[in-house]
Amino acid sequence: MTINLKSAKSPWSSLDGVDQLSLHPIKKAFNKEVMIPGSKSVTNRAFILAGLSKGTSKLSGYLKSDDTYWCIETIKKLGATVEAVGDELHITGINRSELPEKQQVFIGSAGTTARFLPGILGTQEKSEITITSTEQLAGRPHKTLHDALKQLGVKLTYLEKEGQLPVTIKGAPETGGKVSIAGNQSSQFISGLLMAAPLFNKPTEIELTTKIVQSAYVDITIEMMKQFGIHVDVSDDYTHMKVEQGEYEAATLPLEADLSTACYFMALAALNKSTIKINHLNMKSHQPDLEVVDILEKMGATVEKGTDYVVISGPEQLKGNLTIDMNACSDQALTIGSLAVFADGPITITGVEHIRHHECNRVTALTESLTKLGIEVTEHQDGWTITPGDVKAATLDTYDDHRVAMSLSLMGTKVDGIKLLDPSCVSKTCPTYFEMLASLGILVEYH
C-alpha cells in the first residue's frame, strides 16, 4: 500500500472514511461479558524477538492494529518470514548477520517499534537501515535512546532534524559494553537497549541515572526475553542491568490480552452503574494498567478478581475527593480524568508529566477537552485537579491519539451531544473499539 507520512493507517485499520462519530447515553444499565484483543506492548515485543530468533515462533492471541501491522511489515522487510496459520502467526526469524545490507522501513506511528528496533539494527556491522515514520512519531523523543546506543558503538545519522526520525542506523565492529541512561523519560528506551543487548559483540551493562518510569514495562521485556531464551540480570531497584551475549530461540506463546484496552470497559461499567466481566485476562500480568482495578475500587466500584477474569460493578455515585498518583499506569490517566467529571468531589491526578510527550501532549489535550465541555480543570505540570460539574455538548478533537479518543468516548455514554473527530485513530491499538461499545448496547452514529 502507499505510505503516507501523515497517516499510520494500515489494512488493519477501521472506520476508514469516518470523519466523526456521535455517542449517546446508555438508557439501561448492562450486565455483560467481553473478551479483549491482544496486548500491543506484548505483541510488538514478541514480533520483534521472533523476527530475530533462530527457528519458527508460533504466536497466538496477537493484536491486529495499525501499530502491530507496521511492526510485522518491518520485520518482513528485514528478512523474517511471516505466515498466518489459523489463529496463529508463524514467524521464522533471521540471524543478525542476515540483516539486509541496505533497507528502508516505515514504522507508522508505532512508538514501541521506534524504540525497540534501533539497537537491534546496530548489531550488524554490514547493514545500513533507515527508519522512517509518520510526522507525529518523528517528533516524539528519541535522542536519549540514540545517544545511549552511540555509547554502545552504534552509528546513527539523522536525515532531517537532530534527534528525530528518519534516522539511518549502521553497526560497528565493536558494540556493547557499559552505558548510562536516564530512566525517567520512557521505559521503552530501556527495553530497546535490553532487547538489543544479547546481539552486541560484548556483554552489555546498563546503568540508570534516575528512577525508572513504569518499571512494569521493563518487567514485560525481561520476561519476554526469557521466553525467547535470554536471561537478564537486574538489580532490585532497576538501577543496574546486565545481559550476556546470546542468541534468541524461537518460542510458542499465547499473548496476553491488552489490559490498557480492558480499562476502558471497566471504566464504562463504573461510570454507568453497570456490570462487566472481562474474561481471559492475566490477573498476575506485569502490564501496569492492572492498577486501574484498585483505583476504580477506591472510586466506589465493586470488584471481583479471579485468576483469569475481573468483574467491575459501578456504584450509584462515583467517589471523589481523592489524590491519585498514576505514574505507574499513566496510559490510563485520561480514563480516570474522564470519570472524575462525574465524581462527588474533586480528583487530583499526579505523576504523569511524561505523557506530555506521547502521541500528543496528553495533559494539555485533556485540559482543553474538559474546558470545552464546561468542566473546571486546573492543569499541573504532572497532571490535573478536576472539579465535577455539568457537562455540555461539544465536538471534541481526538488529537490523532487513541488514548484521547477512547477516554473521551466514556463521557459520551453519560451525556448526550458529544461528538468525536477522527475516531479512526483508535486503530492504533483497538480497531474494533467502537464496535465493542455498540455490542454493549451503546448507540454509536458514524458521520
Name these PLM-found stretches.
Residues M1-H447:
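Short, structured segments at the rim of ligand-binding sites
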